[in-house]
Amino acid sequence: MRKISKILLGLVLVFLVLGLLGCQNNETNNEPYIITFVDYYGNVIKEVNCDGESICEIQEPTKPANVGQRYFTRWSIWPSEWENINEDTIIKPIYTLDNRVITIGGRSIYFYSFFIMIGIFVALGIGVRETGRIGLKKDDLIDGFLWIVPIAILGARLWYVVFEWNQFVYGGFFPSLLRILGFSSGTLDFSSFGLSGLAIHGAFFVALICAYFYTKKRKIDIFKVFDIVAVGFIIAQAFGRWGNFFNQEAHGGIVGGAIGDTMNLSLEQQFNFLRYTLHLPEFIVNNMYITRGLHSVAVEPFTGYYHPTFFYESMINLMGFGIMLLLRRYKKIHFGELLSFYLIWYGGLRIFIESMRTDPLVFEIFGITMKSATVTSILMILAGIGLSVFIRLRRKGMDYSTAKNPWF
């Protein structure tokens, strides 16, 4: 037994030594290698031949040109990592995303409008599934949807215009009216048409007002409809914010902040914070690289990586949506309290988001500049609390215990 033990111990030692030698050999590579820089299409921009004996000195090539609406952000390997390369390597350019879904005949469909429509139809589908469960008719919901949604979009537009008045109203009545309606040129030039400014608060409040009159006309329980609207809005917003992502708008400040005209973090550090500290998907981080003054110097004072507040808002709205689905299954929740929850949830969320955004809609009162969304959100929270108290006191027995088998 002792001999066998000694033999086994000897074999273990041999394998350990061989393993260590193997590891040492793998760390050293004296073979020549080539580092190749390519452009967006894979064409070679520059080749660097390295002898493998010493650290290869690499001079960064000229930055590749933009491709359509995509612009260059960085190389696939950061310059600080080039000295660690010891084998044939292809370094590719990383670009921002195109904000167009498709272009046909010179006219483009943008992700902004695409995600808004996706959100609207998802909200409609969820609402239709809910109507039968709480004693409403599908046709009533669909009829209301067909005329309330366009008016709500108009409300979102007008809300935005009111706080950006000088951007739209100048040069006479009709040019101003056309700009408000979406013709940015101020003429009936359909190539310039597009609703590039919408505010969700305007859409929400106009939708509630329209729903009030619609339910009065159809003699429907308004609080049941309000709950459907609230659930629909929060999921529609979760989708809609991705349109802001592709437009590189409604973002937060530069990652790491800045002192005066100097960013606190390098571009690589900004990228690493979003990618490896917050663990955001790389395609999101790449598209948060925004050039100085893309919308205005006040909004983007630096070229660098900005906080994706759209993503934070979208994810937190999805959480709120999930909670609302659970609340609908709780029999003691009264009809209308989902609207209360939405007002409080989104009001609090929007105050948090507005504290980071660089492009808020503002107004002045008594010489004090205020953020429109922050003031509105505070009022939403107060309204949500007041509505919940009113429902509990005045609508006893009108709760989800009367609903049929819950969905989700």
For each feature predicted by the language model, list its residue ranges:
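Extracellular/surface recognition and adhesion modules
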Residues: F37, F72-W75, P93
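A feature for loop-to-transmembrane-helix boundaries and adjacent hydrophobic helices
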Residues: S5-L8, L20-N29, T96-F408
